[in-house]
């Protein structure tokens, strides 16, 4: 009985389903607009979408499953249907615009003629076939341009189109602002990053191939030693925090036994890499050896009572050493400063760059000129009627300057005037000395003392009793005479002294090349009777460097503070790691 009831129920289920299912609507999706709608169950493969009014009914081949009358309709389909007629009363500017086609507008804002022209353009573009397939885009653009020129919009529709474009531009202008803001933000960020990179000048793996290979070896060794300490602590505590591979678990106990040797190798390798490094030393480079020494000391400590604490300290040192090794290997560094020799000529703080050195160089140059003149005057030091020296006897430093025709003429005229003044001077005026002329001789002695120095006399010293122009008062390097030597003339030089002073007063013109060579004889003879003077060396010229001592002291104090704070943070982190390992792996 029960079996018959079960068979009857099973047989009645399909019958009930076929009877009830057609009465329930099913949900379908339009193939064109992708919108869902509910239709009768029998029409699930042949329905018209209420949204897009398209027929949905297809065969297995993808064709329609019935004949569609619209496919055989020859009337061209209009993409823009004309709307309702507006009132005859002009309400807008476009309606009051005269002299244009006032045809009724469609729903898109264009008149019927312009809509027809746009439809023709679309059809012709769809039927376009290029002559050359390689120039398909160029030919299409030319063809479209010709069609738009042929079917132009009327003035009314042209204004309507421009108004619509301006309205859309105002409506969506915020999108352009957002675009420009994003572009500016991204560009400024990239520029800042590039500028910071150029300013910092930090480079990855710039220490050299040998140094980077040693750093990488230190990193690998530190990681292996850290895993060995973790495995030892796990086995000692009976916990399993990290599941390591079986092969690695077999090797790590052997590595832990030789932890002292591995730490020593890491320490030695790090020192060798530091000496061969082409970059600057950083803080991890200084902290890593300290931690390695501490780890080696924990290995040397052997006490049963402190075995657990020593293991925790050893694990903390291994973990922190791994972190520092990663920082040493992977962080960018600045390169070392280029070593440049401190040459006297090129150094900014050398003696050659000071005014004293410039004057001393001018002093030596003038002394060489006077020595050259002395060698010429040794031939006839007391013959005023001697012929003037030739131009080729001038020193080499002035030969290039005085080889021009203008300077040669000036020098020859000066020599002639000097020789005439020697020949026309009376002898009694030279032999006797009148003591009433003491005041004039005092001024002449000042000029003579200026002339007796090793510097080439300046314009002010050579024309002290003459009227000078503004061009002659222009300062020169020769006037920077720091060796202020004033020696009184002895009595034995009274004849030469009066002779040079009187000749200076009677000489009408002066040259920029110093006194005439006939006047240098007294200076040469005077050098035999003058006692050599001790030249005092100038003070230190490195004053600009010493002035920075205060700033360097302040910056050094700040550096000491920063280093102290960093060391304190390192030890605080180390103590926290020791406490963490102690809490995790301490036995109850």
Swiss-Prot record:
**Subcellular location, record wording:** Nucleus inner membrane
Region Disordered: which residues? 378-457
Bilayer topology: Multi-pass membrane protein
An example of a Gene Ontology cellular component annotation for this protein is: nuclear inner membrane
Classification via InterPro entries? Ima1_N, TMEM201
Nucleus: is it a keyword of this entry? yes
- Taken from the record's topology, the Nuclear segments are 1-212, 276-280, 331-564
Q: Name one GO biological process term.
A: embryo development ending in birth or egg hatching
> Per UniProt, which keywords does this protein have?
Membrane, Nucleus, Transmembrane, Transmembrane helix
Q: Where is the composition biased (Low complexity)?
A: 384-396
Please give the knockout or disruption phenotype noted for this protein. Answer: Nuclear migration defects in hyp7 hypodermal precursor cells.
Main localization of the protein? nucleus
Q: Which residues lie on this side of the membrane: Perinuclear space?
A: 234-254, 302-309, 586-588
Give the molecular function GO annotations.
actin filament binding; lamin binding
Bias (Polar residues) ranges: 418-430, 441-452
Provide the transmembrane region boundaries. 213-233, 255-275, 281-301, 310-330, 565-585
Highest taxon of the source? Eukaryota
Q: Which family does it belong to?
A: Belongs to the TMEM201 family.
Functional note: Plays a role in nuclear migration in hypodermal cells.
Query: Can you name this protein?
Result: Transmembrane protein 201 homolog
């Amino acid at each position: 009985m029960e079996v018959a009831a079960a068979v009857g129920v099973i047989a009645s289920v399909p019958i009930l389903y076929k009877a009830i299912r057609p009465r329930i609507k099913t949900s379908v999706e339009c193939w064109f607009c992708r919108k869902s709608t509910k239709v009768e169950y029998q029409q699930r493969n042949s329905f018209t979408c209420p949204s897009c009014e398209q027929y949905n009914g297809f065969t297995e081949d993808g064709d329609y499953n019935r004949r569609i009358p619209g496919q055989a309709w020859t009337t061209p389909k209009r993409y823009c249907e004309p709307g309702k007629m507006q009132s005859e009363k002009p309400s807008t500017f476009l309606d009051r615009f005269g002299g244009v086609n006032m045809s009724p507008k469609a729903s898109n804002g264009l008149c019927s003629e312009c809509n027809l022209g746009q439809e023709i353009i679309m059809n012709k573009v769809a039927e376009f076939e290029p002559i050359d397939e390689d120039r398909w885009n160029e030919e299409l653009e030319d063809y479209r341009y010709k069609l738009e020129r042929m079917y132009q919009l009327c003035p009314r529709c042209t204004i309507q189109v421009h108004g619509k474009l301006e309205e859309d531009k105002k409506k969506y202008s915020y999108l352009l602002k957002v675009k420009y803001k994003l572009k500016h933000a991204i560009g400024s960020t990239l520029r800042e990053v590039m500028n910071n990179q150029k300013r910092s000048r930090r480079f990855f793996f710039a220490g050299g191939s040998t140094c980077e290979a040693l750093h990488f070896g230190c990193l690998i060794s530190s990681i292996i030693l850290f895993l060995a300490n973790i495995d030892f602590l796990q086995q000692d505590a009976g916990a399993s925090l990290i599941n390591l591979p079986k092969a690695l678990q077999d090797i790590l106990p052997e590595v832990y036994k030789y932890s002292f040797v591995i730490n020593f190798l890491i320490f030695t390798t790090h020192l060798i890499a530091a000496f061969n490094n082409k970059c600057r030393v950083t803080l991890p480079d200084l902290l890593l050896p300290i931690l390695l020494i501490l780890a080696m000391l924990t290995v040397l400590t052997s006490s049963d009572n402190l075995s657990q604490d020593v293991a925790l300290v050893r694990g903390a040192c291994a973990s922190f050493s791994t972190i520092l090794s990663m920082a040493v290997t992977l962080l960018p560094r600045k390169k070392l400063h280029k070593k440049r020799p401190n040459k006297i000529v090129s150094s900014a703080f050398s003696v050659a760059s000071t005014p004293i050195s410039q004057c001393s160089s001018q002093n030596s140059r003038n002394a060489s000129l006077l020595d050259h003149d002395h060698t010429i005057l040794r031939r006839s030091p007391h013959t005023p009627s001697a012929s003037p020296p030739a131009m080729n006897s001038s020193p080499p430093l002035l030969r290039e300057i005085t080889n021009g025709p203008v300077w040669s003429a000036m020098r020859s005229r000066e020599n002639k005037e000097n020789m005439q003044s020697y020949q026309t001077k009376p002898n009694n005026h030279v032999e006797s000395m009148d003591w009433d002329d003491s005041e004039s001789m005092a001024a002449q002695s000042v000029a003579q003392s200026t002339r007796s120095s090793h510097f080439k006399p300046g314009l002010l010293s050579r024309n002290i009793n003459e009227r000078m122009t503004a061009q002659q008062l222009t300062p020169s390097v020769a006037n920077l005479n720091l060796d202020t030597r004033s020696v009184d003339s002895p009595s034995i030089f009274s004849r030469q002294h009066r002779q040079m002073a009187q000749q200076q007063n009677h000489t009408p013109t002066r040259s920029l090349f110093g006194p005439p060579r006939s006047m240098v004889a007294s200076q040469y003879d005077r050098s035999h009777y003058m006692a050599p003077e001790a030249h005092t060396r100038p003070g230190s010229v490195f004053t600009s460097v010493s002035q920075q001592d205060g700033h360097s002291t302040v910056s050094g104090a700040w550096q000491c503070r920063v280093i102290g704070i960093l060391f304190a943070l390192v030890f605080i982190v180390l103590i926290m790691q020791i406490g963490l390992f102690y809490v995790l792996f301490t036995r109850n």
